[in-house]
Amino acid sequence: MKLAFLIDPIAALDPTHDSTVALMEAAQLRGHEIWIGEISDLSVHVGEPLGLLRPLKIEPVQWLGDRWQVANPWFTAGEAKRRSLHDFAAVFMRKDPPVTTAYLYATYLLDLVDPKKTRVVNSPEGLRHANEKMYALQFQSVVPRTLVSSNKAEIRAFLDELRAAVLKPLGGKAGEGILFLDPGDRNFNSLVEISTQQGQLPVMVQQYLPEAKDGDKRIILVNGEPLGAVNRVPTGREFRGNMAVGGRVEAVPITDRDREICAAVAPRLRQDGLFFVGIDVIGGYLTEVNVTSPTGIREIDRLNGVSIGDQTIAALEALVNQG
């Protein structure tokens, strides 16, 4: 198959951590042809979706038991050519968040891809629908108590009821802007005013789960099925476990409760065309559903001796072959 990946600038990607690289590497190892571009390389000509794309060859990284071995250079990209997206069996939309105006417009261009000819992963409509904070609220049986509001008095009352909470910007990523709220914090008003832009933007306020100190579990789902998990544990004085803010990773099993959560969300994920997803679970509760560019493949592979990328591409092959 020919596969196109819409990514961030490839020279800025870390091949030992980036899940997009892991997916492209797995696809190449399975014999597929890889092409790359950025969302600014998309266009539509007389109704035909096009991309200014480059063929890519990757030198696979190797885990040596205590470190990654990476070739220098680890990739070779060929000459850019303007190609119809219908030349590809699938197009992976792997631009990292935040969801900007440019990102949103790219999904509109990808709407012009005929799903009978080419599968877009994840679905552009699904990407627009699934705000990574709000999407989880559809599944009330498995989420912690949550308020979404821009009203300071309402947030204050909810915090007083909970005694401790976590505030999350609705457009944040990788733990950015997440705050721990304590009823006794004299900075409460300022924190809420800054986060809501003086009451103009809603934020999510979620019950603080004490189990967060033991880790934030990332579970990778492919076509609704859980393939693997990694635990991200806060370090030092940081209460967030995100890898981007220094959280350490450790192996963790997928529990029966995790499978209950996955079973609750899977039908909606499939309905919305969300093929590759990372959900976050703390203390047996679903806290986020990550759909734009979920990470965690390299860490799960390294800790468990598996290849989530290979399993993902195999699942894609099965879908494409079904037609």
UniProtKB/Swiss-Prot annotation:
ATP-grasp domain sequence ranges: 133-317
Swiss-Prot/TrEMBL keywords: ATP-binding, Glutathione biosynthesis, Ligase, Magnesium, Manganese, Metal-binding, Nucleotide-binding
Chain segments annotated as coiled-coil in the UniProt record: none
Free-text remark on how the cofactor is bound: Binds 1 Mg(2+) or Mn(2+) ion per subunit.
GO CC annotation, single: cytoplasm
Binding site for ATP: 159-215
Residue positions binding Mg(2+): 288, 290
Metabolic or biological pathway, per its Swiss-Prot or TrEMBL entry: Sulfur metabolism; glutathione biosynthesis; glutathione from L-cysteine and L-glutamate: step 2/2
Position of the signal peptide: none
EC number(s) reported in the record: 6.3.2.3
A GO MF label: ATP binding
Cofactor needs: Mg(2+); Mn(2+)
Catalytic reactions of this protein: gamma-L-glutamyl-L-cysteine + glycine + ATP = glutathione + ADP + phosphate + H(+)
One of the Pfam families matching this protein, by short name: GSH-S_N
Residues that span the membrane, as ranges: none
Enzyme class: ligase
Family the UniProt entry places it in: Belongs to the prokaryotic GSH synthase family.
Stated name of the protein: Glutathione synthetase
Origin species: Synechococcus elongatus (strain ATCC 33912 / PCC 7942 / FACHB-805) (Anacystis nidulans R2)
